[in-house]
Amino acid sequence: MRFSDEKMEAARNFANKLWNASRFVRMNLTIDEVRLPNADRLALEDKWILHSFNRLAESVNANLEKYEVGVALAAIYEFTWDVFCDWYIELAKARLNEKESEGNRICQQVNTYVLNGILKLLHPFMPFITEEIFSSLPHLPGD
């Protein structure tokens, strides 16, 4: 693999995007433990991001089993940047501004659940930053 300034800059930008997304999630946290509510209590955007994340996890696992590391990493990158950060976090901001509402608490749960999942998928590729962020978040029981 050749060294590339462009790839280094892209990797730095991605790490920065991940760090800022985690800061946003942590800044809006009032929960101590992640417990996803029943599906009937989830907003449409929550169902969408959870479904998208589950598809991502299946894709990453399948690609890693086939030793398609680059394909797996590209899928995580695209999901994190384009889906989670650019869409879901933007959609979540309105609900997170509704302090003390059920929608706010559910949004915190989903935000934290998906971010924890992204960090687990990214950990083999970016162990130091993912460990630092993961250790600062609440988790599912037994995580």
Predicted regions and their residues:
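Helix-rich, typically C-terminal accessory recognition domains appended to large enzymatic cores
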Residues: 1-143
